[in-house]
Amino acid sequence: MEFYKNGNGAVESFCEGHDPLNWNMAAESLKGSHVDELKRMVSDYRKPVVKLGGETLTIGQVAAIASHDGGVRVELSEEKRAGVKASSDWVMDSMGKGTDSYGVTTGFGATSHRRTKNGGALQRELIRFLNAGIFGSSLDSTHKLPHTATRAAMLVRFNTLLQGYSGIRFEILEAITKFLNGNITPCLPLRGTITASGDLVPLSYIAGLLIGRPNSKSVGPKGETLSPAEGFKLAGIDGGFFELQPKEGLALVNGTAVGSGMASMVLFDANTLAVLSEVMSAIFAEVMQGKPEFTDHLTHKLKHHPGQIEAAAIMEHILEGSSYVKEAKKVHEMDPLQKPKQDRYALRTSPQWLGPQIEVIRAATKMIEREINSVNDNPLIDVSRNKALHGGNFQELPIGVAMDNTRLAIASIGKLIFAQFSELVNDYYNNGLPSILTGSSNPSLDYGFKGAEIAMASYCSELQFLANPVTNHVQSAEQHNQDVNSLGLISSRKTSEAVDILKLMSSTFLVALCQAIDLRHLEENLKIVVKTTVSNVAKRTLTVSPNGELHPSRFSEKDLLTVVDREYLFSYIDDPCLATYPLMQKLRAELVEHALKNGERERSANTSIFHKIAAFEEELKTILPKEVDNARIEIENGKSEIPNRIKECRSYPLYRFVREELGTSLLTGEKIKSPGEECYKVFNAICAGKLVDPLLECLKEWNGAPLPIS
């Protein structure tokens, strides 16, 4: 990319000779993998200083300033001072010459036919009439913009103003910087902007604070409400409130920073949740004993879509060498003609489902990243050509469209998570896991994830409703001057709500996946106990005579062990010797089958197999329940014979984080802890950004490419 300096001292991030329409720049920005892009965002997020120059602000930096409450500092590029001053001086010179300029000597919007020579008073009136927001009572925060979104808006707005096209003094930008670095946040109304001619109403409250309007409050570092004077003092801004010069009020409010600032925060989370959904889909395949061929690169290469190819490659990487996949292969080889040939859509087509959502979120991210580095004022002050340009860069369809599209993608991700969760808790589909992931020995007093499944349906329903677009609900405003408008902030707000719901769904699903992992561990260890006990009892009652000699009609217990292998453990393990449960029924059927083949020998009590069935069953009923109970206690105390397979998988960092760092555990009816308490821990961790490191650790060995086709 080539750069040049314009007359305002700003550096342009495009070259008219080589890329006049900016398509190449847009395409270049999408190079590399989505995971690499997330890593860059996280790296930007964790830097202690954000150096602003007007053209290089990133999504990660906006998210950092928004959420760190002063822990990350902002520094303005001193090189920009001259360009900013030049545009400010141009406005003053123009007014001194009697030039008629919009927003300087004229009214605003549909009333721009009005004229005045009192430029300062005009700016004050602009701020006054735009202070039209409603905050509600002091105890009610539902009508206030979240302080994180306000911090994001402040950062984005003065990044735009730094480019030197807005006609505002550098000192005002320095004052806003002091507010940010001092963690002093203006109070902005949540509603009241259509994000065309910018976010006029909310931004007017930042301007109101700068000029000392009594109704413009701010919140201090400890959450205390501050008057304008208290805010200035705490921020260390000397010289008192600002007397706005001509154009400066318009420069402060005529921007899209509130919508694009919130969009930046939303997209930082959306990108993280998108990668999380890919990894969780792979874990879902592991615990469901899925067939990994759905990730084969040839399938996805033939479809050509990069999002799908990357989603499949990520899942392929997680599943490569997975201990669960190796074990599942043995399961699938047993009676293959009696099992489905392929997995259901929620597993098998997860790369095809998630791929387009990744592409949409990436495209939206780049669109918003361009937006937060753009100039949105009207008019634009072009010092080099000695003119003010009247246009419409405040028309923020990039925000509205990007957020509508992102919200639809988020809803689609949520729909897949819900489908996967529904299969996971349903014993008709989940390949042997207990119904609703019941973890205790008494399912009649343990209903596992039944409540969580109901909650997931609620989350998913609300999320699908939020997927509806905002931008098709435009109303003509401001005396039909603003007859089309973007609704960018409204769309950003709704997408923020959608992201929050997806966090709830992801938290619940992740807790359920960890429950399933532990249940597979329990299943494997208890099956060893069942097989060992059946084998020993069979040897004593079916193979050896009372005198210690081999029984004339003995048969190997191997066939009985095959019965145990074929039967889902959780279909009988709560009462393993119950006559109506499948284990005892099928063991008896196997013995009867052998007895029928025994022919004439069944007539003699010494050689009959049939006569020994009762003895076999009686001894098994005496021993097996005790052995199972003892094994459960040992496993709960961490003394299992077989270690948890998850430790041999690339998905282990996420499991370890949820279980060890967050302190969650296997949920059972005997324990007091509820599913919601465990989901809350994961939800809080996601909101605090703590899940990013274990998530990326799952992919630390991935080289950014699918496995070679072999």
Swiss-Prot record:
Task of the protein: This is a key enzyme of plant metabolism catalyzing the first reaction in the biosynthesis from L-phenylalanine of a wide variety of natural products based on the phenylpropane skeleton.
Metabolic or biological pathway, per its Swiss-Prot or TrEMBL entry: Phenylpropanoid metabolism; trans-cinnamate biosynthesis; trans-cinnamate from L-phenylalanine: step 1/1
Family matches, as CDD domains: PAL-HAL (cd00332)
The record's account of how the chain is modified after translation: Contains an active site 4-methylidene-imidazol-5-one (MIO), which is formed autocatalytically by cyclization and dehydration of residues Ala-Ser-Gly.
Active site: 102 (proton donor/acceptor)
Keywords of this entry: Cytoplasm, Lyase, Phenylalanine catabolism, Phenylpropanoid metabolism
PROSITE patterns named among the record's database cross-references: PAL_HISTIDASE
Cross-link (5-imidazolinone (Ala-Gly)): 196-198
Enzyme class at the top of the EC tree: lyase
Residues that coordinate or bind (E)-cinnamate: 254, 342, 348, 378, 450, 478, 481
Gene source species: Rubus idaeus (Raspberry)
Name of the molecule in the record: Phenylalanine ammonia-lyase 1
Gene transcribed to yield this protein: PAL1
